[in-house]
A protein has these predicted regions:
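C-terminal helical cap(s) of enzyme catalytic domains, especially alpha/beta-barrels
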Residues: 89-108, 380-404
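Glycine-rich dinucleotide-binding loop and its adjacent helix/turn
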Residues: 519-535, 593-613, 634-687, 787-797, ...
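Iron-sulfur cluster-binding cysteine motifs and their immediate structural context
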Residues: 448-469, 490-520, 565, 572, ...
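Beta1-alpha1 glycine-rich phosphate/pyrophosphate-binding loop at the start
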Residues: 458-468, 476, 505, 509-513, ...
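FAD-site-proximal beta/loop scaffold in flavoenzymes
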Residues: 642-665, 744-816
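Glycine-rich phosphate-binding active-site loops on the catalytic face of alpha/beta enzymes
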Residues: 76-86, 247, 364-391
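Glycine/Thr-rich beta-alpha phosphate-binding loop at enzyme active sites
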Residues: 22-38, 248-347, 382-400, 641-642
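A conserved FAD-binding loop/helix module that cradles the flavin
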Residues: 809-837
Length: 999
């Protein structure tokens, strides 16, 4: 496929807007319009402005449809994508693709517009007309309630050249341009298509599109050049002017220190740009002169803060050597520069702001007197343009009618607070891979990432919704269908579902684990009386081990009518959860409630009973035996000198003795997993202990433990000793070799190398939490084949061992695993024993419209009454790729005969920025992998995408590429061999979405 975009004719754009609004009540995929209240209007550059927010010069202001979508959602100030003398194919060839990565902080390697400069002007003027139309036609606001601001660069010679100069003049006065006349004529010729927009309104559309400019210069541009451009725009063009400043004005030391403190120490940047860019001591007098000049001319002048921040590509983020950082990591730098300049000029220097602005800081920025504010990175995330609606709502009434000055003290506080603000600080752990291992299908690609990420594929959106509605019993029924341990998993689950949750791209995951526990706690008494075993099926099964996997196996067996006996060597069932996991993490009551489900179904639990022979059980008439014996062989770490304590033994002793152990004042825990975190927290609570040190050979960022576990350990005062490798214990001191982080491996984890430096850590006791192993003696004693690592050889789909009718589940199958993985193992074994499916999916209910009401709305758990308010119900609607595409090149369409909307990719609108790949939950890139509509056969030939080009709309003849084969197709012919679902999709495009087809 080509990364060259094709501009749509004005008539096609206008038809698209009107027909989509009429048919779907959306505009370019934006569902909820923002309607401006005139009482909140303000004035800038002598013109009216309804909201002080809009899209920054970048991907969201390149094409007309981007600007229209922004306006519909609530934007009113449009900083148009930069134009310069290099443009079109020449510029596009210099931009490596994909060029955007925005799954956390943002990065890009793009420049100015990839259109030709004349085409860019055409897009802006088409958008100018359409905004005037929809403001009146759809009742969104005043026709003069928005403003366009041109962004020009990169040097004075280029700006004075015919290409850019013609652009500037055309945007200042467009009445004689061909595109202005075309747009005006189309509206007059089609005036009967409008209900509210009149011929008089058409005649009144002003031709002076903009009266302001933002100067964008390349890094290293001399101050004299910047000032000469500003002088030219002010004196020759009489444009209100902003000069874009770079974060490099803060100096290298400030930027490096700030990024390191905030967790962005992995960002690599040198001091070159800080030395080469505009220097602060040059900037202040230059800005002083320009302020005086503009005042004398009766124009407004200010700075645009800030440009993006150049960093090196070191982890294959983008196909470039250098990229530009934006978003949450840029905010503390940009707002600090704003504070510095504002203090310098006593609040009299006007600032147009961009640099990590989003819903959570927009009111504070505007409240300081900084506006307009433009955005990019937040719009690149799920919710997309719809995020503007919440942003516009939040700033209503904050701005004065006319700008006065900046509140310097408030701005200083905002800058100081940004350094520790959780919305901008980097998480301790690296951003996890949130993608599935599956490739996106051409049709029906919606699915819930949480359910997919759960080893037992729980129906999470369904029980979250039921819990939110207060239907706790029904929610617990949904949970118990697939999860036998709602109390235990509601407390301790490793919650991969939450890692995969799309809500992470908004602010934080839906609290799925907590919701499960809420449903269990509130639904238990209503449901426990109804729990009973299934009709007897004649099967008799023994389960060895009463831990999570064993309890789960017994639950599913008994529910389906099998007679089940659990053999547990301890005094009570519960396994590691009861005897090892500390009581401050889970109480016995929660464990007992989960066990009560199997007790209600008549499962026999024989405690204090250790089984050594599987053959003996079979001789007693058991049809099958499930081994859920755990992985209890201690992991070891041999020191050159001194003894260590195994973590599981310590935790067992801690729990058995209520923390009354003699382990000294200084305790070292070696390890970085969840068991190490439990051990450190328990040691902190042990009688007589004063200091607990957690020693790990890498840094916190690379510890296997979950982030929430790490945070709890930090909050409780455990001292982290990073980059240390233990050597020996002698005289109350643990000697460690200092380690050094090396290159990243393919998984993104840093390697480590040993240095000659030695570090001492006070240590009366050293506890080792470095992984438990499977005790293979039981397997070999029972003639069960094991592999070279001592694990039982099993059928991966059934977990049956080499001994017929004997299965392995839980930690004893694969080594230390999660609780929910143990439940999955139990399901696999039970399914094979019974020869049938044992779980059923919950029904998907509710109105799809409710899903779209939540899109684009940022809301933390603490801000919501229930998690149902935040759950995006991805099992009904995903459309992440539709949300995040700046160009609207991924389209959701209704196909007759299909339950859910389908997504197609529109080739001629795409520039291969790659943003949709980051947010698609599949291991795919929608711009490459979704069924694609091409404008013509040439475009199709230039692409490898499966897709189609419409040859004749009337006869529905197309050329189609499917699984790489190109054929001619008549979409409405039942005899045509093309897959029926794709024929339906093509027919829907032709019949109901004809505006997508270019003429």
């Amino acid at each position: 496929m080509s990364d060259m975009m094709t501009c749509m004719p004005f008539g096609q754009l206008m038809d698209w807007v009107l027909q989509e609004k009429k048919g779907q009540d959306t505009v370019f995929g934006v569902h909820r319009p923002y309607t401006a209240d005139p009482k909140n209007d303000m004035t800038i550059f002598t013109r009216n402005l309804e909201t002080p927010v809009g899209p920054a010069a970048g991907p969201h202001t390149q094409l007309a449809q981007n600007i229209i979508a922004s306006y519909y959602a609530g934007a009113r100030f449009f900083e148009l994508k930069t134009v310069q003398k290099m443009d079109g194919a020449e510029l596009s060839a210099c931009v490596n693709k994909p060029c955007i990565l925005a799954d956390d902080e943002g990065y890009n390697c793009e420049w100015s517009t990839e259109l030709t400069v004349p085409d860019a002007m055409g897009e802006y003027i088409k958008a100018w007309f359409i905004l005037h139309v929809i403001a009146k036609e759809f009742g969104l606001g005043a026709q003069d309630g928005f403003q366009f601001n041109i962004s020009v660069g990169y040097d004075l010679a280029g700006i004075k050249g015919d290409k850019v100069n013609t652009f500037i003049d055309g945007m200042m006065e467009a009445k004689d341009t061909v595109i202005f006349q075309e747009c005006r004529k189309w509206l007059l010729d089609n005036a009967d298509k409008f209900q509210n927009f009149t011929r008089e309104d058409i005649e009144a559309i002003p031709s002076n599109v903009c009266n302001s400019a933002t100067i964008s210069t390349l890094h290293g541009c001399p101050p004299q050049e910047i000032e000469s451009i500003a002088n030219y725009l002010l004196t020759e063009k009489h444009l209100n002017t902003f000069v874009k400043c770079n974060p490099t004005l803060l100096g290298y030391d400030f930027a490096r220190k700030t990024m390191d403190e905030m967790g962005y120490d992995y960002m690599v940047f040198g001091d070159f740009h800080f030395r080469d860019d505009l220097q602060y001591e040059d900037a202040v007098p230059m800005l002083t002169r320009l302020m005086k000049l503009s005042e004398g001319l009766g124009l407004e002048f200010g700075v645009k803060i800030t440009n993006t921040f150049p960093v090196d590509v070191t982890r294959n983020e983008l196909p470039s050597e250098e990229m530009y950082m934006s978003g949450k990591a840029l905010f503390p730098l940009s707002i600090s520069l704003a504070a510095k300049l504002s203090a310098e000029f006593a609040g009299k220097l006007r600032i147009s702001y961009s640099g990590g602005a989003d819903y959570y800081n927009i009111d504070k920025i505007v409240g300081c007197g900084i506006w307009p504010v433009t955005m990019a990175t937040t719009l690149l995330k799920t919710g997309g343009y719809q995020r503007f609606t919440q942003v516009a709502d939040k700033v209503e009434g904050i701005c004065p009618k006319k700008w006065e000055r900046i509140d310097v003290d408030a701005l200083k506080k905002l800058a100081a607070d940004a350094i520790t603000d959780g919305h901008h600080v980097k998480n301790i752990k690296p951003v996890p891979n949130r993608k599935s291992t599956k490739e996106v299908p051409l049709l029906d690609c919606f699915y819930a990432p949480c359910s997919e990420g759960c080893p037992i594929h729980q129906d999470i959106p369904q029980y979250v919704a039921l819990t939110g509605e207060g239907k706790y019993k029904e929610a617990l029924e949904v949970i118990l269908e697939k999860n036998a341990l709602p109390f235990i998993t509601g407390t301790l689950c490793a919650h991969n579902c939450m890692t995969k949750c799309t809500r992470n791209f908004y602010e934080e995951s839906v609290n799925i684990r907590g919701t499960k526990l809420t449903a269990a706690e509130h639904g238990y008494e209503q449901l426990i009386g109804e729990i009973k075993a299934g009709e007897p099926n004649g099967k008799k099964v023994a389960v060895i081990g009463g831990g999570p996997a064993g309890i789960a196996a017994a639950y599913f067996l008994a529910r389906e009518g099998a007679a089940v006996t659990i053999f547990e060597k301890e005094e009570k069932a519960g396994g590691v959860i009861r005897y090892v996991i500390p009581g401050f993490r889970i109480g016995d009551d929660a464990i007992d409630k989960d066990i009560s489900f199997i007790q209600k179904m008549g499962v026999e639990i024989r405690t204090n009973t250790e089984i050594t022979s599987v053959a003996d059980l079979k001789a007693q008439g058991y049809d099958a035996v499930i081994l859920a014996i755990g992985a209890g062989k201690p992991g070891t770490l041999k020191l050159e000198k001194g003894e260590t304590v195994n973590a599981l033994k310590f935790l067992r002793d801690f729990k058995a003795n209520d923390g009354k152990l003699n382990i000294g004042k200084n305790v070292v825990v070696i390890g970085g997993g969840n068991t190490a975190m439990d051990t450190a927290r328990a040691a902190k609570r042990t009688e007589g202990v004063e200091h607990v040190y957690l020693v790990y050979r890498r840094t916190k960022r690379y510890m296997p433990a979950a982030e929430d576990e790490l945070l709890e350990v930090l909050e409780e005062g455990v001292e982290f000793k990073e980059l240390l490798s233990p050597v020996s214990l002698d005289g109350g001191r643990l000697l460690c070799k200092k380690m050094k982080l090396g290159q990243m491996d393919a998984s993104g984890r840093a390697g480590v190398t040993e240095t000659a430096d030695v570090v001492e850590v006070p240590a009366d006791t050293v506890i080792v939490a470095v992984g438990e192993k499977i005790d293979t003696d039981f397997y070999t004693a029972n003639q069960i084949a094991v592999d070279e690592r001592g694990k039982a050889k099993v059928n991966d789909k059934t977990l049956e061992t080499s001994v017929s009718g004997v299965y392995v589940a839980g930690d004893g199958a694969r080594g230390a695993a999660t609780i929910v993985e143990g439940i999955r193992d139990a399901q696999l074994a039970v399914k094979d024993i019974l020869g049938k499916e044992i779980t059923r999916d919950a029904a998907v209910t509710g109105d799809v419209k409710d899903c779209f009401e939540k899109k684009g709305i940022l809301k933390h758990s603490k801000e919501a009454k229930t998690e149902e308010e935040r759950c995006l119900t991805c099992n009904k609607v995903c459309e992440n790729c539709v949300d995040v595409c700046p160009n609207r090149a991924n389209i959701s369409i209704k196909v007759p005969g299909m339950a859910m909307n389908q997504v197609i990719h529109v080739d001629y609108m795409c520039n291969e920025c790659g943003n949709c790949k980051s947010f698609c939950p599949y291991a795919s890139a929608p711009y490459k992998d979704k069924f694609t509509l091409f404008a013509n056969e040439k475009d199709m030939a230039d692409s490898k995408n499966d897709g189609f080009v419409v040859l004749d709309k009337e006869n529905k003849t197309c050329k189609v590429r499917f699984v790489g084969q190109i054929t001619d197709c008549k979409a409405d012919d039942p005899a045509d061999k093309l897959y029926d679902g794709l024929k339906k999709l093509i027919c829907a495009v032709i019949d109901d979405y004809g505006y997508l087809i270019t003429k």
